[in-house]
A protein has these predicted regions:
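A short, gly/pro- and small-residue-rich
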Residues: 53-73, 125, 129-132, 187-198
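Conserved beta-strand segments of alpha/beta enzyme cores
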Residues: 23, 65, 79, 140-143, ...
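Flexible loop/turn connectors
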Residues: 155, 159-265
Length: 265
């Protein structure tokens, strides 16, 4: 499930590129792209891999026009298109608070915020810490964030949350991704914690699996077609204009309501 999101995004990017008569060649390693850079006008990168600053600098020297989708590892070197996950976290908190929920936890994996430095904290968690403090929400002891973005991680962290709060479960949890949320729901069900009766769950990504969990998963949809189309347009414009300033675009998300959380009307 963790890889499915990026697999789907690659497929959507390929479809959009063909529709715009753009030829794509796939590379799995940055060094291979650096070696063959003379054959290309630009690149689009997909995936969560941490790329070292020295490799990114070398790539920029040989291929200065590039767009990163979903991450922004080198804002001063390349363009980027990302889902607006900080706003998504704020929207989720606002939705939960409007539904009378004040004790809100977070479950997620470990990621990197990159630039000249690497910070070992996923941007969704950074946004959650920021917005809960600004909104005056008590998240003390309600944050579980470690490991990969997998079902196993969700199951492990879900079990930890139940063990810590069996008698005082938070009103709701925001989960960083559907792949983790699947494991969280499994852990809650095994422990007799009923969603949404005992706690609500909101996730992010709206992968196909969200329709088939028990309960079905309320999740923020990331429009992959919009990400891909924007990236292609951005790259084509950068190449044609030979601009040196870099553009960074955020795409909004949309809540798809299912059974794990139904907002108050």
């Amino acid at each position: 499930l963790a890889d499915a999101y990026f697999d789907e995004l690659r497929s959507v990017l390929g479809d959009n590129a063909r529709a715009q008569h753009m030829e794509l060649t796939s590379f799995s390693h940055i060094d291979d792209l650096i070696a063959d850079a003379g054959d290309f006008d630009g690149f689009i990168s997909i995936g969560p891999s941490v790329l070292s600053s020295d490799r990114l600098l070398k790539l920029h020297l040989v291929l200065p026009y590039g767009v990163f989708i979903d991450i922004n590892p080198a804002p001063s070197l390349f363009d980027s298109v990302q889902p607006d996950l900080s706003q998504t976290i704020l929207d989720a908190l606002d939705m939960l608070v409007s539904s009378g929920k004040r004790r809100i936890g977070y479950i997620g994996g470990t990621g990197f915020t990159m630039g000249l430095y690497e910070y070992p904290e996923d941007g969704r968690l950074t946004a959650f810490r920021n917005w809960t403090e600004r909104l005056g929400l008590d998240a003390e002891g309600l944050i579980y964030a470690q490991g990969a973005f997998t079902v196993d991680t969700g199951r492990t962290l879900g079990e930890e949350a139940v063990n810590d709060h069996r008698d005082d479960m938070p009103d709701a949890f925001i989960v960083a991704a559907d792949s983790i949320a699947v494991g969280v729901l499994q852990a809650f069900t095994a422990a007799g914690v009923l969603v949404p009766r005992d706690t609500s769950v909101i996730s992010i990504n709206n992968q196909a699996i969200a329709q088939y969990t028990s309960p079905t998963l309320t999740s923020y949809d990331i429009d992959q077609n919009e990400l891909a189309d924007t990236a292609i347009t951005m790259l084509a414009e950068a190449i044609s204009s030979r601009r040196t300033l870099h553009h960074h675009t955020f795409i909004s998300t949309t809540l798809v309501v299912r059974d794990s959380f139904v907002p108050a009307r």
